[in-house]
Structure formats: C-alpha cells, structure tokens
Amino acid sequence: MPNFAANLSFLYTELPFLDRFEAAAKDGFKAVEFLFPYSYDSQDIAVRLKTNDLKQVLFNLPPAGVDASSIEQAWVNGMRGIACLPERGAEFAQGLDLALRYANALQCKQLHMMAGIVSAATSTASAQQTYIQNAKYAGQQAAALGINILIEPINMRDMPGYFLNRQEHAHALLQAIDQPNVKVQMDLYHCQIMEGDVLQPLQQYLPTGKV
C-alpha cells in the first residue's frame, strides 16, 4: 500500500502556511512535506505537526542564502541550490547547518540537497568535484542526527542548466560520494521526461536500497 505525503507548498494554498497542516490532517494525510520551512519558527511548525498527528518526511536545503530573508530572495531570483557551485562552500555549510537544525526540531529524517544551475563560466568537472565534496560533507554532518541526504535528478525542460538530470548520473555520484546516508530521490515525473521508460530504472535501482 503506497503512502502519500501532502506537499504543503502546493496544496491548500488558499490557507496561510501554518493552517495547511490541519487541512492535510482533515483530508486523511499522515505525512507532509514542503519546499522550505525557513520563514517560520521551527517550534511553530513542530506544534502543528504534533497537534495534527503528522509526520514531516521531507524538505529542501536552502537554494542559497543563510537566513529566512536571503533564502526567500534567492528562490525568487532563480537560485536552485549551490551544492555544485565552486566558491560557495561556506554558504553551503551554513545553509546545511540551518537545515539540520530545522530537521532535528521537526524530527524529519530526509533532506533534499538541491544541486544548482551550472553557469557557462563553470566547467562540468569543477561542478562535479564541488558537488561530490559538498554531498560528502552533508552526509557526514547529517549522519550524526540519523538523517538521510537525498539527491534528485531534475529534468532540463523545467529547469534548464540544472546539474543533475539522469538516474545513471545520480547513482554514479553516489559511488564517488561514498556515504551510506546519501541516497537518490527518484521522481518519476522528471525521470519520464528525461529517460522515457521509467520501468527500466525502477527495476535497475530500486533493489539497490539507494532510492
């Protein structure tokens, strides 16, 4: 039996964000996810989760920035992660620390690490090396809290220039990252656009325990 989580960034948008938890619970959901929690106090979210008997299953690391204001502005400005961007290592580490503090407060055991959009000035090799270093660091920091770091291939039609697009690349990166708590978030929507036949990668990668 599949389990479904309500994505509160896209559902119940007629309600203020903190009221969406109750709406999801009333519709029978037992779990929720959303893009980012950073504009809200973690304890306010934790109260909504507990009051409505909901489990927080996933949210994203900051797309860039280190506090609520800069994170929100980065998203509006089109930033989609900095994990693959050279010279942004300190900012990445600060964003990771913030995400882990929120995850710990919300008892959330999975965080999505957005890769980022590669600029024309950045070589593929440099982006890949930076990404592996940041993912390894994220995995090490998250492991102490029992949290998984997820990497997700995203299609190039919706997000041109995004560093990570295909399942094969994601699983090759896992080999280089070599952290057991870094796994692939396999979104079938993105997979279908990029690779067409979703059955083949499901059969290939689900048995690995890395999805």
Language-model features: locations:
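Catalytic-core regions built around general acid/base machinery
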Residues: 45-53, 134-142, 201
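Active-site acidic/histidine proton-transfer and metal-coordination neighborhood
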Residues: 78-183
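Hydrophobic residues within beta-strands of alpha/beta enzymes
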Residues: 32-33, 111, 149, 211
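Histidine/acidic-residue-rich catalytic or RNA/ligand-binding cores of hydrolases
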Residues: 194-202
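Active-site-proximal loop/turn and secondary-structure-junction residues that shape catalytic pockets
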Residues: 10-12, 38, 62-65, 115-119, ...
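Generic enzyme active-site microenvironment
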Residues: 31, 150-153, 185-188, 192
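N-terminal pre-domain/capping segments
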Residues: 1-104, 175, 179, 183, ...
